[in-house]
Curated annotation (Swiss-Prot):
EC number: 2.4.1.17
Subunit structure: Homodimers. Homooligomer. Interacts with UGT1A3, UGT1A4, UGT1A6, UGT1A7, UGT1A8, UGT1A9 and UGT1A10 to form heterodimers.
Role summary: UDP-glucuronosyltransferase (UGT) that catalyzes phase II biotransformation reactions in which lipophilic substrates are conjugated with glucuronic acid to increase the metabolite's water solubility, thereby facilitating excretion into either the urine or bile. Essential for the elimination and detoxification of drugs, xenobiotics and endogenous compounds. Catalyzes the glucuronidation of endogenous estrogen hormones such as estradiol, estrone and estriol.
Annotated protein name in UniProt: UDP-glucuronosyltransferase 1A1
Glycosylation sites: 89, 297, 435
The organism of origin for this protein: Rattus norvegicus (Rat)
SUPFAM superfamilies in UniProt: UDP-Glycosyltransferase/glycogen phosphorylase
GO molecular function, one term: steroid binding
Gene name as annotated: Ugt1a1
Amino acid sequence: MSVVCRSSCSLLLLPCLLLCVLGPSASHAGKLLVIPIDGSHWLSMLGVIQQLQQKGHEVVVIAPEASIHIKEGSFYTMRKYPVPFQNENVTAAFVELGRSVFDQDPFLLRVVKTYNKVKRDSSMLLSGCSHLLHNAEFMASLEQSHFDALLTDPFLPCGSIVAQYLSLPAVYFLNALPCSLDLEATQCPAPLSYVPKSLSSNTDRMNFLQRVKNMIIALTENFLCRVVYSPYGSLATEILQKEVTVKDLLSPASIWLMRNDFVKDYPRPIMPNMVFIGGINCLQKKALSQEFEAYVNASGEHGIVVFSLGSMVSEIPEKKAMEIAEALGRIPQTVLWRYTGTRPSNLAKNTILVKWLPQNDLLGHPKARAFITHSGSHGIYEGICNGVPMVMMPLFGDQMDNAKRMETRGAGVTLNVLEMTADDLENALKTVINNKSYKENIMRLSSLHKDRPIEPLDLAVFWVEYVMRHKGAPHLRPAAHDLTWYQYHSLDVIGFLLAIVLTVVFIVYKSCAYGCRKCFGGKGRVKKSHKSKTH
């Protein structure tokens, strides 16, 4: 009987031991502070936070009281701080941005409008950051919480200021930063001869004029970005009680989690603390709801086209919406169009308007034939993951560059949403659906993207935990951060060697000149004196 009891106890203890060994250990659990940015930036970060919580870590998210997407969650603790603006102001800023892309104003007027909007929105966001940093009670409570690390999106460097104020190692979660601030802050080489600048629409194989364009953008982008980023340097200088620039704020980051992949991006140099996690938002596809399953099944052999211009575009001008509706009505596929604006009067029977759609799940369905997208990084990677050729209508920001990259890889067709006609959209859709090369190219990219030793989400979680365990990753920080600009480019060494060469040349020249005078100058004087004596 005792033998049986001992055997039963052993069997009961075995799962417990396995849980202790394989499960999250309380002794290794850490505390992570998260300072996100509202919108798609936050939505892409949620998977990492959820995984960290499931592994036993305590996650605290801080956000302004006026937030659209950042809400309470079951796998993190939410702490909100007061700001001098309301939810309506944030919503209005997003709506105005989506509406402005369809403006047909002259170029210079659009530039002025964009500049004023960027300045206005930046001022609002800066005021929110300032209210956080000047909230002494709130900041003191964060300091007393003894976090192990900070996870933030450096697109707005408020989290970077908090990290330095609390002396926390920082992990950055981003796609890219404007004006190549990410490359500058990481000291990452980016030769202008083959690394295209953001917003240039160049490829990595540039002709002479494209390289000239690349150089001009490089020379002017820092000036343009001062509107957004220089005030953060001034705010940080006040809070940290030392003179700092935005580059000084960003460069101490331990790890840069970049939502990039060389399947989409052109090959270029990267630094040891830059980790590529492109496709992290490509979640495992789920079963469709009855509503969407019915739409897909009703499409028959022709299949479906998924159409979304992102959450920022809530309304399209009537004339443009009717042109789009006309083009969609000319194809045999069923079109699922995510659109919250006014229903076009000429909407065809094959086009279904929905206020929301499970984009990744629909793209993962075997009947998905094409994807009409605004070329945001989320949509591009979901198109790659699921192997669906794209018709791209970039609207602003890095979307133009994303579309260019996919087009050069033969995975889609790009249209100018302002200039395109119904015929253009119809032809583009028929091209990517009927020309097999587009499907073959996107499937090849999908295969390359998925052929990796570790999933992007697991890789991101590993590096966040790594920084929490080791209190940073200083061994990955290059010494370039500690050099002056002339030391980095070895200008002092070049100057020193040049001085030596010039000195040697000068000495040799003087020696030769002296020798020539001795050899030839003396004979001349002797001959001259001899002639004078004969006379």
